[in-house]
C-alpha cells in the first residue's frame, strides 16, 4: 500500500484525517509545512501527496506556508508524483481573481467583482459598483474581513478601521 503524505499547516484539519487513515490502516506521513525543509536536490519519496494548504494560513501565524507549498507542489509535480489538490488547486485557493475567472470560464455566474490592492484602490473600485457592496479580502479565512457597506461612508469607515489582508 502506498504511503499518503499529508501536506498542511493546520493540525485541526489534519487530525480527523489522520484518525481515519489509522482506522483503515493506510500509512501516512505528516508534512506539516510550518517547519518543513525541502531538499530540492533530491527526488521526492514515492507515494500519494494530499495537499490541504489554506490561503488563510497567515491568520494562524503561518505567513509563508502557501508560498512554500507552491514550491513543494512544483517539485512533486516535476518529479511526476501523484498529487491530490496540486498546484492548480492551490492557485485557485490563493486568488479570488483566479477563482472568478475560472467560474466565468465554466459559465457560473457570480456578483460583479472589482479587485484592488489597498484602501485607495478599494474606494476607486467602489465607483464601478452599486451599493450595497460586499468587500472581501483575497486571503483571510473563516469569513474574516467580509463586510457589507450600504454607502461610501460606511465603506470608508470600514477600510480605515481594519488591517488589510496580506494581498
Regions found by a protein language model. Give the residues of each.
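Conserved N-proximal alpha/beta basic substrate-recognition cap immediately N-terminal to
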Residues: 9-112
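Active-site nucleotide/adenylate-binding loops and adjacent lid/helix of ATP-dependent enzymes
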Residues: 80, 88-167
Amino acid at each position: 500500500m502506498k504511503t499518503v503524505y499529508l501536506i498542511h499547516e493546520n493540525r485541526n484539519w489534519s487530525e480527523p484525517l489522520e484518525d481515519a487513515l489509522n482506522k483503515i490502516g493506510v500509512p501516512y506521513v505528516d508534512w506539516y509545512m510550518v517547519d518543513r525543509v525541502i531538499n530540492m536536490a533530491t527526488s521526492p519519496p514515492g507515494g500519494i501527496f494530499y495537499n490541504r494548504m489554506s490561503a488563510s494560513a497567515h491568520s494562524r501565524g503561518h505567513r509563508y506556508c502557501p508560498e512554500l507549498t507552491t514550491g513543494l507542489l512544483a517539485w512533486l509535480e516535476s518529479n511526476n508524483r501523484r498529487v491530490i489538490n496540486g498546484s492548480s488547486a492551490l492557485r485557485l485557493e490563493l486568488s479570488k481573481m483566479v477563482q472568478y475567472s475560472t467560474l466565468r470560464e465554466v459559465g457560473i455566474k457570480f456578483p460583479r467583482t472589482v479587485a484592488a490592492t489597498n484602501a485607495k484602490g478599494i474606494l476607486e473600485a467602489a465607483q464601478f459598483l452599486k451599493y450595497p457592496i460586499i468587500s472581501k479580502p483575497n486571503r483571510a479565512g473563516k469569513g474574516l474581513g467580509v463586510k457589507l457597506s450600504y454607502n461610501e461612508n460606511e465603506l470608508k469607515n470600514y477600510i480605515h478601521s481594519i488591517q488589510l489582508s496580506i494581498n
